[in-house]
From Swiss-Prot:
This is Large-conductance mechanosensitive channel. Keywords: Cell inner membrane, Cell membrane, Ion channel, Ion transport, Membrane, Transmembrane, Transmembrane helix, Transport. Gene3D superfamilies: Large-conductance mechanosensitive channel, MscL, domain 1. Belongs to the MscL family. It is found in: Cell inner membrane. The gene is mscL.
Length: 136
């Protein structure tokens, strides 16, 4: 089998296509969450904390010199990224939880018939004995 045919067979399998769609949707969802956090959640939090713009929060390690930019630890952006991650992780958790719940409902097998009671067993034995006597 040629390399192109092998690749085509690999790429056309359902799992690979599903994964690719999931990655594309996940990337788009990540951008939506990042915008939601940066543009909707963080501004009110900044106002509550005294007009702080989280994206500007940083510690300057070395001031700008000439054309070289300053060296900073941008912990405000890091805080935003942590909030992004938390929201995405929670959304994925809720999605997986919903999918697992649906799978459990599908997997519920029909209950096996209950074991016969002693009375039923005795009646079955009597029936079998009567049949055996009639056949003689």
């Amino acid at each position: 089998m040629s390399l192109i045919k092998e690749f085509k067979a690999f790429a056309s399998r359902g799992n690979v296509i599903d994964m690719a769609v999931g990655i594309i949707i996940g990337a788009a969802f990540g951008k939506i969450v990042s915008s939601f956090v940066a543009d909707i959640i963080m501004p009110p939090i900044g106002i509550i904390l005294g007009g702080v713009n989280f994206s500007d929060l940083s510690i300057v390690l070395q001031a700008a010199q000439g054309d070289a930019p300053s060296v900073v630890i941008a912990y405000g952006k890091f805080i935003q990224t942590i909030i992004d991650f938390t929201i995405i992780a929670f959304a994925i958790f809720m999605g997986v939880k919903a999918i697992n719940r649906l799978k459990r409902k599908e997997e519920v097998a029909p209950k096996a018939p209950a074991a016969p009671t002693k009375d039923q067993e005795l009646l079955s034995e009597i029936r079998d004995l009567l049949k055996a006597q009639q056949e003689k």
